[in-house]
Amino acid sequence: METKQFAVRLLVLLSVAAASASWAAEATDAKCAGMSPDLTIDRVWGASRVKFDALEDKKFIYVSYYDADRWLSVAQVNKCTGEVAKTRVASRFGGWDAHNSIVLALDKSNRLHVSGNMHASPLVYARMDAPDKLAGLEAVRPMIGSDEVQATYPYFFRFMDGALGFSYRSGHSGDGEEFINRFDNAGWVRWTNRPIFAPTSEKKPVNAYHTNYVRGPDGFFHVAWVWRENYFVETNFNVNYAKSRDLKTWQNSAGDVIPLPITPRTAEVVDEIPERSGLLNNIRLGFDEAGRPVISYLKFDAKGATQLFHARLENGIWKTAPATQWTYRWDPRGGGTIKGEINFSGVKVSDGHLIEQVSQPEIGAKTLVYDDKSMKVAEALSPNVWSPSPAVRKVKAPNGAVPNVQVVRFENMAAHESKESHVVTWFSLPADNRDKPRNCDNAAVPCDFTSDLILHTDRRSP
Protein backbone atom coordinates (compact mmCIF):
# COMPACT_ATOMS: atom_id res chain seq x y z
CA MET A 1 0.00 0.00 0.00
CA GLU A 2 2.79 2.42 0.98
CA THR A 3 4.58 1.60 -2.26
CA LYS A 4 1.45 2.40 -4.28
CA GLN A 5 0.93 5.69 -2.38
CA PHE A 6 4.56 6.63 -2.90
CA ALA A 7 4.22 5.92 -6.62
CA VAL A 8 1.11 8.11 -6.82
CA ARG A 9 2.83 10.96 -4.94
CA LEU A 10 5.88 10.62 -7.18
CA LEU A 11 3.71 10.73 -10.30
CA VAL A 12 1.99 13.88 -9.02
CA LEU A 13 5.33 15.52 -8.22
CA LEU A 14 6.70 14.65 -11.64
CA SER A 15 3.57 16.02 -13.31
CA VAL A 16 3.83 19.26 -11.33
CA ALA A 17 7.54 19.53 -12.14
CA ALA A 18 6.89 18.95 -15.82
CA ALA A 19 4.12 21.54 -15.85
CA SER A 20 6.36 24.01 -14.01
CA ALA A 21 9.19 23.41 -16.44
CA SER A 22 6.83 23.89 -19.37
CA TRP A 23 5.45 27.09 -17.85
CA ALA A 24 8.96 28.36 -17.12
CA ALA A 25 10.03 27.66 -20.68
CA GLU A 26 6.97 29.48 -22.03
CA ALA A 27 7.61 32.36 -19.65
CA THR A 28 11.25 32.54 -20.71
CA ASP A 29 10.24 32.49 -24.37
CA ALA A 30 7.71 35.23 -23.65
CA LYS A 31 10.35 37.40 -21.96
CA CYS A 32 12.83 36.66 -24.75
CA ALA A 33 12.13 39.14 -27.52
CA GLY A 34 14.77 37.40 -29.62
CA MET A 35 16.83 38.86 -32.42
CA SER A 36 15.86 40.58 -35.60
CA PRO A 37 15.92 38.17 -38.57
CA ASP A 38 18.56 40.45 -40.13
CA LEU A 39 20.71 42.06 -37.45
CA THR A 40 23.48 44.44 -38.51
CA ILE A 41 26.45 43.80 -36.23
CA ASP A 42 29.04 46.26 -37.52
CA ARG A 43 30.68 47.80 -40.55
CA VAL A 44 33.60 45.64 -41.73
CA TRP A 45 36.67 45.91 -43.94
CA GLY A 46 35.96 44.32 -47.31
CA ALA A 47 38.94 45.22 -49.50
CA SER A 48 40.37 41.73 -48.99
CA ARG A 49 38.49 38.43 -49.00
CA VAL A 50 39.63 37.08 -45.65
CA LYS A 51 37.85 34.46 -43.54
CA PHE A 52 35.89 35.57 -40.47
CA ASP A 53 34.48 33.16 -37.86
CA ALA A 54 31.27 32.74 -35.85
CA LEU A 55 29.95 30.36 -33.19
CA GLU A 56 27.17 30.16 -30.63
CA ASP A 57 26.55 28.69 -27.21
CA LYS A 58 23.29 28.59 -25.27
CA LYS A 59 23.24 32.31 -24.51
CA PHE A 60 25.36 34.16 -27.03
CA ILE A 61 26.52 34.28 -30.63
CA TYR A 62 30.13 35.37 -31.14
CA VAL A 63 31.44 36.79 -34.42
CA SER A 64 35.07 37.71 -35.16
CA TYR A 65 35.96 40.06 -38.00
CA TYR A 66 38.00 43.09 -39.09
CA ASP A 67 36.01 46.26 -38.53
CA ALA A 68 35.91 49.17 -40.97
CA ASP A 69 39.12 50.54 -39.45
CA ARG A 70 40.75 47.08 -39.85
CA TRP A 71 40.92 46.24 -36.13
CA LEU A 72 40.51 42.59 -35.17
CA SER A 73 37.14 42.66 -33.41
CA VAL A 74 34.74 40.36 -31.56
CA ALA A 75 30.99 40.91 -31.28
CA GLN A 76 28.83 39.20 -28.67
CA VAL A 77 25.13 38.96 -29.55
CA ASN A 78 22.62 38.15 -26.81
CA LYS A 79 20.32 35.50 -28.30
CA CYS A 80 17.45 36.54 -26.01
CA THR A 81 17.49 40.31 -26.48
CA GLY A 82 19.49 40.85 -29.67
CA GLU A 83 21.79 43.24 -27.81
CA VAL A 84 25.25 43.52 -29.40
CA ALA A 85 28.43 44.14 -27.39
CA LYS A 86 31.77 44.62 -29.16
CA THR A 87 35.45 44.80 -28.35
CA ARG A 88 38.66 45.30 -30.29
CA VAL A 89 41.70 43.08 -29.96
CA ALA A 90 44.96 45.05 -29.98
CA SER A 91 45.84 43.91 -33.50
CA ARG A 92 45.23 45.83 -36.73
CA PHE A 93 44.94 44.15 -40.13
CA GLY A 94 47.22 45.43 -42.90
CA GLY A 95 44.28 45.25 -45.26
CA TRP A 96 45.35 42.99 -48.12
CA ASP A 97 46.57 39.54 -47.08
CA ALA A 98 43.81 36.91 -47.27
CA HIS A 99 45.99 34.51 -45.24
CA ASN A 100 45.12 36.52 -42.12
CA SER A 101 42.01 34.50 -41.27
CA ILE A 102 40.38 34.59 -37.83
CA VAL A 103 39.37 31.61 -35.66
CA LEU A 104 37.25 31.33 -32.52
CA ALA A 105 36.69 28.62 -29.90
CA LEU A 106 35.13 28.12 -26.48
CA ASP A 107 36.95 26.14 -23.81
CA LYS A 108 35.33 23.81 -21.27
CA SER A 109 34.68 26.77 -18.95
CA ASN A 110 32.91 28.66 -21.75
CA ARG A 111 35.63 31.27 -22.16
CA LEU A 112 36.09 32.55 -25.69
CA HIS A 113 39.49 32.29 -27.41
CA VAL A 114 40.42 34.16 -30.59
CA SER A 115 43.43 34.06 -32.92
CA GLY A 116 44.12 35.61 -36.30
CA ASN A 117 45.73 38.43 -38.29
CA MET A 118 49.04 36.72 -38.96
CA HIS A 119 51.02 35.45 -41.93
CA ALA A 120 54.57 34.49 -40.98
CA SER A 121 54.23 37.15 -38.27
CA PRO A 122 53.97 37.18 -34.45
CA LEU A 123 51.18 35.04 -32.99
CA VAL A 124 48.03 37.03 -32.24
CA TYR A 125 45.99 35.40 -29.48
CA ALA A 126 43.51 36.61 -26.84
CA ARG A 127 40.93 35.09 -24.52
CA MET A 128 38.22 36.04 -22.05
CA ASP A 129 39.12 36.45 -18.40
CA ALA A 130 35.77 34.93 -17.39
CA PRO A 131 32.86 33.22 -19.15
CA ASP A 132 30.31 35.40 -20.98
CA LYS A 133 32.31 38.62 -20.50
CA LEU A 134 34.35 40.23 -23.28
CA ALA A 135 36.91 41.57 -20.80
CA GLY A 136 40.36 40.15 -21.51
CA LEU A 137 39.93 39.89 -25.28
CA GLU A 138 41.42 43.31 -25.89
CA ALA A 139 44.93 42.22 -24.84
CA VAL A 140 47.16 40.09 -27.07
CA ARG A 141 49.03 37.50 -25.02
CA PRO A 142 51.47 34.66 -25.74
CA MET A 143 50.41 31.00 -25.65
CA ILE A 144 53.64 29.15 -24.91
CA GLY A 145 56.14 31.91 -25.60
CA SER A 146 58.32 29.96 -28.03
CA ASP A 147 58.04 29.44 -31.80
CA GLU A 148 55.53 32.29 -31.96
CA VAL A 149 57.44 34.85 -34.04
CA GLN A 150 56.41 33.63 -37.52
CA ALA A 151 52.93 32.14 -37.13
CA THR A 152 50.32 31.30 -39.80
CA TYR A 153 47.19 29.15 -40.18
CA PRO A 154 45.72 29.19 -36.64
CA TYR A 155 43.28 26.37 -36.02
CA PHE A 156 41.36 25.41 -32.84
CA PHE A 157 40.11 21.86 -32.33
CA ARG A 158 39.06 19.44 -29.57
CA PHE A 159 41.09 16.63 -28.07
CA MET A 160 39.31 13.34 -27.45
CA ASP A 161 38.52 14.39 -23.85
CA GLY A 162 37.04 17.71 -24.98
CA ALA A 163 40.05 19.86 -24.05
CA LEU A 164 40.81 22.73 -26.40
CA GLY A 165 43.67 22.28 -28.87
CA PHE A 166 45.46 24.73 -31.16
CA SER A 167 47.54 24.10 -34.26
CA TYR A 168 49.61 26.56 -36.26
CA ARG A 169 52.58 26.82 -38.58
CA SER A 170 55.83 28.37 -37.40
CA GLY A 171 57.98 29.57 -40.29
CA HIS A 172 57.39 30.33 -43.95
CA SER A 173 55.72 28.67 -46.91
CA GLY A 174 58.14 25.98 -48.05
CA ASP A 175 60.05 26.18 -44.76
CA GLY A 176 57.69 25.69 -41.81
CA GLU A 177 57.02 23.50 -38.78
CA GLU A 178 53.61 22.52 -37.42
CA PHE A 179 52.97 22.70 -33.66
CA ILE A 180 50.09 21.58 -31.42
CA ASN A 181 49.22 23.21 -28.08
CA ARG A 182 46.71 22.05 -25.45
CA PHE A 183 44.71 24.27 -23.10
CA ASP A 184 43.98 23.32 -19.52
CA ASN A 185 42.60 25.67 -16.90
CA ALA A 186 46.14 26.60 -15.89
CA GLY A 187 46.95 27.71 -19.45
CA TRP A 188 48.49 26.43 -22.67
CA VAL A 189 51.16 23.73 -22.88
CA ARG A 190 53.11 22.41 -25.85
CA TRP A 191 51.62 18.99 -26.66
CA THR A 192 54.61 17.46 -28.44
CA ASN A 193 58.28 18.16 -27.83
CA ARG A 194 58.92 18.09 -31.56
CA PRO A 195 56.88 19.56 -34.43
CA ILE A 196 54.44 17.31 -36.29
CA PHE A 197 55.90 18.05 -39.73
CA ALA A 198 59.53 18.80 -40.55
CA PRO A 199 60.68 22.07 -42.21
CA THR A 200 63.44 20.38 -44.22
CA SER A 201 64.00 17.20 -46.20
CA GLU A 202 67.41 16.02 -47.35
CA LYS A 203 68.77 19.52 -46.67
CA LYS A 204 66.02 21.14 -48.76
CA PRO A 205 63.26 23.25 -47.19
CA VAL A 206 59.72 21.85 -47.24
CA ASN A 207 56.37 22.68 -45.69
CA ALA A 208 53.33 20.46 -45.10
CA TYR A 209 49.91 21.85 -46.05
CA HIS A 210 47.55 19.64 -44.09
CA THR A 211 43.86 19.08 -43.47
CA ASN A 212 42.34 19.51 -40.05
CA TYR A 213 43.01 16.72 -37.57
CA VAL A 214 39.79 14.84 -38.28
CA ARG A 215 38.29 12.47 -35.69
CA GLY A 216 37.31 9.24 -37.38
CA PRO A 217 34.76 6.59 -36.38
CA ASP A 218 37.66 4.33 -35.35
CA GLY A 219 38.75 6.58 -32.45
CA PHE A 220 41.78 7.97 -34.29
CA PHE A 221 42.62 11.45 -35.46
CA HIS A 222 43.36 11.37 -39.19
CA VAL A 223 45.29 13.89 -41.28
CA ALA A 224 46.25 14.20 -44.95
CA TRP A 225 48.63 16.68 -46.51
CA VAL A 226 50.75 17.73 -49.47
CA TRP A 227 54.35 18.90 -49.32
CA ARG A 228 55.53 22.17 -50.87
CA GLU A 229 59.12 23.00 -51.71
CA ASN A 230 58.82 26.79 -51.72
CA TYR A 231 56.44 29.75 -51.88
CA PHE A 232 55.15 28.84 -55.35
CA VAL A 233 52.00 26.73 -55.48
CA GLU A 234 53.25 24.67 -58.44
CA THR A 235 55.92 23.08 -56.18
CA ASN A 236 53.31 21.03 -54.29
CA PHE A 237 54.05 17.31 -54.43
CA ASN A 238 52.72 13.98 -53.05
CA VAL A 239 49.51 13.26 -51.15
CA ASN A 240 50.30 11.82 -47.70
CA TYR A 241 48.46 10.37 -44.70
CA ALA A 242 48.92 9.64 -40.98
CA LYS A 243 46.76 8.87 -37.93
CA SER A 244 47.06 9.15 -34.16
CA ARG A 245 44.98 8.36 -31.07
CA ASP A 246 46.48 11.11 -28.94
CA LEU A 247 48.17 13.51 -31.42
CA LYS A 248 51.53 12.56 -29.92
CA THR A 249 52.28 9.14 -31.37
CA TRP A 250 51.67 9.01 -35.11
CA GLN A 251 51.20 5.98 -37.35
CA ASN A 252 50.79 5.12 -40.99
CA SER A 253 47.69 3.25 -42.18
CA ALA A 254 49.32 -0.10 -41.33
CA GLY A 255 49.87 0.95 -37.70
CA ASP A 256 53.63 1.49 -37.96
CA VAL A 257 54.88 4.37 -35.81
CA ILE A 258 56.22 7.41 -37.68
CA PRO A 259 58.79 9.36 -35.64
CA LEU A 260 58.34 13.11 -35.30
CA PRO A 261 58.82 15.31 -37.11
CA ILE A 262 57.35 13.59 -40.17
CA THR A 263 59.42 14.14 -43.33
CA PRO A 264 58.79 13.38 -47.02
CA ARG A 265 61.03 10.34 -46.61
CA THR A 266 59.21 8.90 -43.54
CA ALA A 267 55.65 9.85 -44.54
CA GLU A 268 53.18 7.37 -45.99
CA VAL A 269 52.65 8.38 -49.62
CA VAL A 270 49.05 7.92 -50.77
CA ASP A 271 49.60 9.22 -54.30
CA GLU A 272 53.10 10.02 -55.56
CA ILE A 273 52.65 13.20 -57.57
CA PRO A 274 55.56 15.24 -58.94
CA GLU A 275 55.70 19.01 -58.81
CA ARG A 276 53.86 21.00 -61.50
CA SER A 277 51.15 18.35 -61.83
CA GLY A 278 48.15 20.47 -60.84
CA LEU A 279 48.22 19.38 -57.18
CA LEU A 280 47.01 22.20 -54.95
CA ASN A 281 46.99 22.48 -51.17
CA ASN A 282 43.18 22.50 -50.89
CA ILE A 283 43.22 18.81 -49.92
CA ARG A 284 40.27 17.39 -47.90
CA LEU A 285 39.68 14.27 -45.78
CA GLY A 286 36.43 12.47 -44.96
CA PHE A 287 35.04 8.95 -44.41
CA ASP A 288 32.74 6.62 -46.30
CA GLU A 289 29.89 4.62 -44.77
CA ALA A 290 32.32 1.83 -43.78
CA GLY A 291 34.47 4.34 -41.88
CA ARG A 292 37.32 4.22 -44.40
CA PRO A 293 39.28 7.45 -44.91
CA VAL A 294 38.72 9.15 -48.27
CA ILE A 295 41.09 11.91 -49.42
CA SER A 296 39.93 14.44 -52.04
CA TYR A 297 42.44 16.42 -54.12
CA LEU A 298 43.05 17.93 -57.55
CA LYS A 299 45.63 16.98 -60.17
CA PHE A 300 45.97 16.81 -63.94
CA ASP A 301 44.79 13.74 -65.81
CA ALA A 302 46.66 12.16 -68.74
CA LYS A 303 45.19 14.78 -71.11
CA GLY A 304 46.21 17.71 -68.92
CA ALA A 305 42.73 18.56 -67.63
CA THR A 306 42.15 19.16 -63.92
CA GLN A 307 40.19 16.36 -62.24
CA LEU A 308 38.92 15.78 -58.72
CA PHE A 309 40.60 12.61 -57.47
CA HIS A 310 39.79 10.39 -54.51
CA ALA A 311 42.10 8.10 -52.59
CA ARG A 312 40.40 5.51 -50.37
CA LEU A 313 42.00 2.96 -48.06
CA GLU A 314 40.71 -0.46 -49.16
CA ASN A 315 42.04 -3.59 -47.43
CA GLY A 316 45.22 -1.79 -46.43
CA ILE A 317 45.92 -0.35 -49.90
CA TRP A 318 45.27 3.18 -51.12
CA LYS A 319 43.13 3.07 -54.26
CA THR A 320 43.19 6.30 -56.27
CA ALA A 321 40.96 7.31 -59.18
CA PRO A 322 39.47 10.41 -60.81
CA ALA A 323 35.88 11.06 -59.81
CA THR A 324 35.22 13.53 -62.64
CA GLN A 325 35.65 13.82 -66.39
CA TRP A 326 36.14 17.54 -66.84
CA THR A 327 37.85 19.22 -69.79
CA TYR A 328 38.77 22.38 -67.85
CA ARG A 329 42.39 22.97 -66.81
CA TRP A 330 43.22 25.02 -63.73
CA ASP A 331 46.94 25.66 -63.48
CA PRO A 332 47.68 28.46 -61.00
CA ARG A 333 51.29 29.52 -60.56
CA GLY A 334 53.25 31.70 -58.17
CA GLY A 335 52.61 32.75 -54.60
CA GLY A 336 49.98 34.54 -52.58
CA THR A 337 46.33 33.70 -52.05
CA ILE A 338 44.90 32.22 -55.24
CA LYS A 339 41.35 32.87 -56.37
CA GLY A 340 39.58 29.51 -56.14
CA GLU A 341 38.31 28.26 -59.50
CA ILE A 342 37.57 24.72 -58.28
CA ASN A 343 36.41 24.16 -54.71
CA PHE A 344 35.30 21.01 -52.93
CA SER A 345 34.28 20.09 -49.40
CA GLY A 346 35.57 16.55 -48.92
CA VAL A 347 33.16 13.63 -48.68
CA LYS A 348 30.56 12.80 -46.06
CA VAL A 349 27.78 10.22 -45.72
CA SER A 350 24.19 11.48 -45.94
CA ASP A 351 21.17 9.15 -45.95
CA GLY A 352 23.41 6.25 -46.88
CA HIS A 353 25.02 8.05 -49.82
CA LEU A 354 28.56 9.37 -50.17
CA ILE A 355 28.32 13.01 -51.24
CA GLU A 356 30.59 16.01 -51.76
CA GLN A 357 29.94 19.66 -52.47
CA VAL A 358 31.86 20.88 -55.53
CA SER A 359 32.03 24.08 -57.57
CA GLN A 360 33.76 24.22 -60.95
CA PRO A 361 33.38 26.49 -64.01
CA GLU A 362 31.90 23.77 -66.24
CA ILE A 363 29.23 22.56 -63.79
CA GLY A 364 28.75 25.44 -61.36
CA ALA A 365 27.96 24.52 -57.74
CA LYS A 366 26.68 20.98 -57.22
CA THR A 367 26.35 18.25 -54.63
CA LEU A 368 27.95 15.20 -56.23
CA VAL A 369 26.69 11.74 -55.26
CA TYR A 370 29.27 8.98 -55.71
CA ASP A 371 28.91 5.31 -56.54
CA ASP A 372 30.16 3.50 -53.45
CA LYS A 373 32.26 0.98 -55.38
CA SER A 374 33.77 2.98 -58.24
CA MET A 375 33.75 6.39 -56.49
CA LYS A 376 32.61 7.86 -59.82
CA VAL A 377 29.92 10.55 -59.97
CA ALA A 378 26.52 8.85 -60.01
CA GLU A 379 24.40 11.98 -59.76
CA ALA A 380 24.77 15.77 -59.57
CA LEU A 381 22.24 17.50 -57.31
CA SER A 382 21.54 20.98 -55.99
CA PRO A 383 24.19 22.40 -53.62
CA ASN A 384 21.50 22.71 -50.91
CA VAL A 385 21.39 18.90 -50.65
CA TRP A 386 24.75 19.09 -48.86
CA SER A 387 23.51 21.37 -46.12
CA PRO A 388 20.25 23.33 -46.37
CA SER A 389 21.11 26.98 -45.78
CA PRO A 390 19.02 29.31 -43.62
CA ALA A 391 16.93 31.75 -45.61
CA VAL A 392 18.99 34.87 -46.23
CA ARG A 393 17.53 38.15 -47.42
CA LYS A 394 18.75 38.77 -50.94
CA VAL A 395 20.92 41.88 -51.21
CA LYS A 396 22.50 42.89 -54.49
CA ALA A 397 26.28 42.93 -54.33
CA PRO A 398 27.92 46.29 -54.99
CA ASN A 399 29.60 46.51 -58.38
CA GLY A 400 32.89 44.58 -58.25
CA ALA A 401 32.19 42.93 -54.87
CA VAL A 402 31.34 39.32 -53.99
CA PRO A 403 29.19 37.86 -51.17
CA ASN A 404 30.62 35.96 -48.19
CA VAL A 405 28.62 33.56 -46.00
CA GLN A 406 29.82 32.18 -42.66
CA VAL A 407 27.66 29.56 -40.95
CA VAL A 408 27.41 30.02 -37.17
CA ARG A 409 28.45 26.69 -35.65
CA PHE A 410 27.50 25.24 -32.27
CA GLU A 411 30.00 24.94 -29.41
CA ASN A 412 29.37 23.65 -25.89
CA MET A 413 25.82 22.81 -26.99
CA ALA A 414 24.10 20.36 -29.32
CA ALA A 415 22.33 21.40 -32.50
CA HIS A 416 18.99 20.07 -31.25
CA GLU A 417 19.15 22.49 -28.29
CA SER A 418 18.58 25.43 -30.62
CA LYS A 419 15.33 26.34 -32.35
CA GLU A 420 17.18 28.62 -34.76
CA SER A 421 20.01 28.54 -37.26
CA HIS A 422 22.24 31.48 -38.10
CA VAL A 423 24.59 32.69 -40.80
CA VAL A 424 26.73 35.81 -41.05
CA THR A 425 27.06 37.62 -44.39
CA TRP A 426 29.13 40.50 -45.75
CA PHE A 427 30.56 41.69 -49.07
CA SER A 428 34.21 41.95 -50.04
CA LEU A 429 36.34 42.43 -53.10
CA PRO A 430 37.33 39.11 -54.73
CA ALA A 431 40.55 37.31 -53.81
CA ASP A 432 42.30 38.46 -56.97
CA ASN A 433 45.06 40.66 -55.55
CA ARG A 434 47.48 37.88 -54.44
CA ASP A 435 47.68 39.52 -50.99
CA LYS A 436 49.18 42.72 -52.45
CA PRO A 437 47.86 46.29 -52.15
CA ARG A 438 45.35 47.00 -54.90
CA ASN A 439 45.75 49.42 -57.76
CA CYS A 440 42.84 51.77 -57.19
CA ASP A 441 43.26 54.13 -60.15
CA ASN A 442 40.43 52.61 -62.21
CA ALA A 443 38.73 50.41 -59.62
CA ALA A 444 34.97 49.83 -59.82
CA VAL A 445 34.82 50.15 -56.03
CA PRO A 446 37.19 52.00 -53.70
CA CYS A 447 40.18 50.17 -52.24
CA ASP A 448 38.97 50.99 -48.74
CA PHE A 449 35.70 49.16 -49.49
CA THR A 450 33.60 48.39 -46.41
CA SER A 451 30.39 46.43 -45.92
CA ASP A 452 27.68 45.76 -43.38
CA LEU A 453 28.20 42.56 -41.39
CA ILE A 454 24.74 41.01 -40.95
CA LEU A 455 23.60 38.15 -38.73
CA HIS A 456 20.67 36.29 -40.28
CA THR A 457 18.38 34.14 -38.11
CA ASP A 458 16.09 31.43 -39.44
CA ARG A 459 13.66 29.82 -37.00
CA ARG A 460 13.41 26.08 -37.57
CA SER A 461 10.11 24.35 -38.11
CA PRO A 462 8.93 22.40 -35.02
Regions flagged by a language model, labelled:
Residues E26-P462:
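Extracellular, repeat-based ectodomains that mediate carbohydrate processing or recognition
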Residues R9-A19:
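Bacterial N-terminal signal peptides
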Residues M1-L11:
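Bacterial N-terminal signal peptides that target proteins for export
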Residues S20-E26:
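Sec/Tat signal peptide C-region and signal peptidase I cleavage site
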